């Protein structure tokens, strides 16, 4: 009986340490994580977010296609990849699915002033001052009409992060060469293979929504992803960081069950052996 009391005391001490001390230490070391703002309420958006797709295509070809392609509609960028890298130190994204993953209010603000929307004064794309608010609405309507629907987490991650970040464990490599990324951002962006284990999921959601809230001073621009897109990216990073978690958890339950049975048998055996002595 004495041994059982000692075991119970140890269990209580461990549980208090795990559920009491550890969360407190984490809160002291990491502080409060800001909640994501999917309304992008800091942006004063005057541009339209709807319009005529046909007019939008004309405006896209005239104003965007020199740097950006649109594979979904057979439009190739006027500038090839190597020329773009030489000019901007980063590959301009294909915009086929941008309207499916980025909030349309953010997208409108981004087209008008990329530096302000991304909170990155060094962002390579210039403001589109020649476009009226109505023009922006037409472009967004066009982008929405060609975008693929219901992209999964992997697809969104590649769309949103693949120009700068590699995920080598999944054989996904950044479109932009490392030396150019270093020149553009100041350092090579980290590989995302195990980011889902290295960082808490709540932190990742906040960081993706607005990098400055998670890491003030970072050179990563704000992406403007919708809540759904962000959650899919975080879920994907979590899944690939520990792809065997479900199998391990199932096995773990069997191991715990086995240990419980063995503890019970050991205790019963001990009582039987020592009952005449005690």
What are these regions (language model features)?
Residues 53-100:
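Extracytoplasmic/periplasmic/luminal assembly and interaction segments
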Residues 21-27, 88-100, 110-136, 146-149, ...:
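Axial heme c-ligation environment in periplasmic c-type cytochrome domains
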Residues 67-74, 100, 112, 144-145, ...:
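Detector for the c-type heme attachment site
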Residues 29-61, 75, 135-158, 245-247:
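Electrostatic cytochrome c docking/interface patches
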Residues 56, 60-71, 107, 139, ...:
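The canonical Cys-X-X-Cys-His
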Residues 71-90, 162-193, 248:
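Short glycine/threonine-rich turn/loop motifs
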Residues 1-47, 64, 106:
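Hydrophobic secretory-pathway targeting helix
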Residues 1, 238-278:
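C-terminal single-pass membrane-anchor helix
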